[in-house]
């Protein structure tokens, strides 16, 4: 689960992480009030959407204008910048060409920036540990730094038994070239960041840039936080921060029904049980010249109703021109899948090619249900056969 920058900063601040003062605004009047309270003389007006690259982004109605993060020097300019952002669609590298509508603004006090650094904590699969990633190249995408200047990145893996210690934090501070009281400030910053990460079951916290001010303060000028969805049941206060308007409506609906769904840009819908099999299914669709329209894992204990819901989710995408159902019945029974597919196809008046590959528990019964349904369903014997058939059927129907 993702949250907005202002929400991330509010959470981190509770753990002693230093952030600039600021306030969220939904209207021009609220933006003016926040700016007056902060006092100036410099303010930063930031669009709040679930995507990075806001500063370099452009608004659809003003592609040659300024981006979604603006530094201003008067309260009137705060209001004018807010007016130029609210209700407008911001396009960044991460939003895709469709962009995201800006529905709230974060007005923040300006900072006397002397250095920009990068700092994050994440779960490192290679070490199975929480790992600090830091770099002197702040303000840039860390992937770009890793590609062009990998020597400028330092990583520190944290032993889960020991936890983050002061010497870990000082090692990072020294690697970033911090001196004097900056080292102590960075140490406090990191210890608070780690406590927030572990207490709130985060999967990522990224501060880019982490800045050193003229007075030696170490501040989070931006903050991005992701949470482990599987741990949200322990954090109802975090769930309340969810902004469903920033998420795909179909993905939100899928979550409500216990489905794992991610919308993609292709035209062949996929319904599979198991994340690994789902990824393999998408790969083989591409191998045969098609493009998957989604990732959809119905799980191992799906009911007929859940399968029907999954089918409707796929068909809710207007770009879907064909569907491939690929089920290996271990825990899942093939006859349950078949019942769900038939029920959904009848309910939505199926109008696109459908290929079903079943294998495993009750496979013969499942195939019988499909064959006797009277629906134009193509049966496949294996995964390659299924992918080849759906790609061919979609091309012929075009």
Swiss-Prot record:
ATP binds at residues 46, 53-55, 108, 111, 116. Binds 1 Mg(2+) ion per subunit. Heterotetramer of two alpha and two beta subunits. Pathway: Carbohydrate metabolism; tricarboxylic acid cycle; succinate from succinyl-CoA (ligase route): step 1/1. Mg(2+) binds at residues 208, 222. InterPro entries: ATP-grasp, ATP-grasp_succ-CoA_synth-type, ATP_grasp_subdomain_1, Succ-CoA_synthase_bsu_CS, SUCC_ACL_C, Succ_CoA_ligase-like_bsu, Succinyl-CoA_synth-like. This is Succinate--CoA ligase [ADP-forming] subunit beta. It is an enzyme of class 6 (ligase). Keywords: ATP-binding, Ligase, Magnesium, Metal-binding, Nucleotide-binding, Tricarboxylic acid cycle. GO terms for cellular component: cytosol; succinate-CoA ligase complex. It comes from Rhodospirillum centenum (strain ATCC 51521 / SW). Its cofactor is Mg(2+). The lineage of its organism: Bacteria, Pseudomonadati, Pseudomonadota, Alphaproteobacteria, Rhodospirillales. Substrate binds at residues 273, 330-332. Its EC number is 6.2.1.5. Belongs to the succinate/malate CoA ligase beta subunit family. GO terms for molecular function: ATP binding; magnesium ion binding; succinate-CoA ligase (ADP-forming) activity; succinate-CoA ligase (GDP-forming) activity. Succinyl-CoA synthetase functions in the citric acid cycle (TCA), coupling the hydrolysis of succinyl-CoA to the synthesis of either ATP or GTP and thus represents the only step of substrate-level phosphorylation in the TCA. The beta subunit provides nucleotide specificity of the enzyme and binds the substrate succinate, while the binding sites for coenzyme A and phosphate are found in the alpha subunit. Pfam families: ATP-grasp_2, Ligase_CoA. GO terms for biological process: succinyl-CoA metabolic process; tricarboxylic acid cycle. It catalyses: succinate + ATP + CoA = succinyl-CoA + ADP + phosphate; GTP + succinate + CoA = succinyl-CoA + GDP + phosphate.
């Amino acid at each position: 689960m993702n949250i907005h920058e202002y929400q991330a900063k509010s959470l981190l601040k509770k753990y002693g992480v230093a952030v600039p003062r600021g306030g969220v605004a939904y209207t021009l009047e609220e933006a003016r009030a926040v700016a007056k309270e902060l006092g100036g003389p410099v303010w930063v007006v930031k669009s709040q959407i679930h995507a990075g690259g806001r500063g370099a982004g452009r608004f659809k109605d003003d592609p040659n204008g300024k981006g979604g993060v603006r530094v201003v020097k008067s309260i009137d300019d705060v209001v004018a910048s807010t007016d130029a952002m609210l209700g407008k669609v911001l396009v960044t590298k991460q939003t895709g060409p469709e962009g995201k509508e800006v529905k709230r603004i974060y007005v923040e006090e300006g900072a006397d920036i002397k250095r920009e650094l990068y700092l994050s904590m994440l779960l490192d699969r290679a070490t199975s540990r929480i790992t600090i990633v830091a770099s002197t190249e702040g303000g840039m995408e860390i992937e770009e730094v890793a590609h062009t200047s990998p020597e400028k990145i330092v990583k520190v893996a944290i032993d889960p038994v020991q936890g983050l210690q002061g010497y870990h934090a000082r090692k990072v501070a020294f690697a970033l070239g911090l001196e004097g009281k900056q080292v102590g400030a960075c140490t406090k910053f990191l210890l608070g960041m780690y406590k927030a990460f572990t207490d709130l079951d985060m999967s990522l916290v990224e501060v880019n840039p982490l800045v050193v001010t003229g007075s030696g303060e170490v501040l989070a000028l931006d903050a991005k936080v992701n949470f482990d969805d599987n741990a949200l049941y322990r954090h109802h206060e975090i769930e309340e921060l969810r902004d469903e308007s920033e998420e795909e409506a179909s993905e939100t609906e899928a979550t409500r029904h216990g489905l794992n769904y991610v919308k993609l840009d292709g035209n062949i819908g996929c319904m599979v049980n198991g994340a690994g099999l789902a990824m393999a299914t998408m790969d083989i669709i591409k191998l045969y010249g098609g493009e998957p329209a989604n990732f959809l894992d119905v799980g191992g204990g799906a009911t007929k109703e859940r399968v029907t819901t999954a089918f409707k989710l796929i068909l809710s995408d207007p770009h879907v021109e064909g569907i491939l159902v690929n089920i290996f019945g271990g825990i899942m029974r093939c006859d349950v899948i078949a019942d769900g597919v038939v029920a959904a196809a009848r309910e939505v008046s199926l109008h696109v090619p459908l290929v079903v590959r079943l294998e495993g528990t009750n496979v013969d019964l499942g195939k019988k249900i499909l064959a006797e349904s009277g629906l134009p369903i193509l049966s496949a014997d294996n995964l390659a056969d299924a992918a080849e058939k759906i790609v061919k059927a979609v091309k012929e129907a075009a």
